Amino acid sequence: MEHILDCRMGWDPADLAYVSSRIVNGDLVVLPTDTVYGIGVRADNHDSVRALLAAKGRNETMPPPVLLASVEQAYEVSTDLSTDAIRLMESFWPGALTVIVQANPSVDWDLGQTGGTVALRMPAHEAVCELLSSVGPMAVTSANLTGQPPATNVEEARGYFSGTVDCYVDSGPTKSGVPSTIIDCAHGDATLLREGAWALKDIATVLGYQPGTR
């Protein structure tokens, strides 16, 4: 039986408790973000992360990013935040910027072949940040099968994951549908990996130099 919980007007406490319990128990959950809908699990649940990758049709060479409830959490999951990473987080979070940083080895996450890094983002979505505060960091990737367009509403997500996921958080259609910009700050100077909601010039303005591209 599918459970669709509406958070458009904020969380009903019982709904937040229910979704939180499902996530803590290791279940896959579809949830909104400020860009597109995502499918996610607790970042520290190894079996759930593997189930997430399988649901997407991915393997461990494509590790999911991690959503955080605050900038402060980034200091807990990374041992070495560069000046560039801090500037970007403080300027664009909460928002549609994913920042790749060196991972803290003591954090017991197995997200796949990360090369000792982790991709972090704090979404500009109050209800989702409240959920993240409840359950902790989540490994979340776009709600679609690999190679297909990402879902921008619950119905599209159900089309991809009906039978695999039975818990959906609905906040209506996403506002932009444009994925986050991805910046690698784990290997020296910042490098743009994907231009999305934020343009390269926006990043350069904050950093004071033009990032490389890859």
Stretch-by-stretch model annotation:
Residues 1-214:
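Active-site-adjacent structural elements in enzyme catalytic cores
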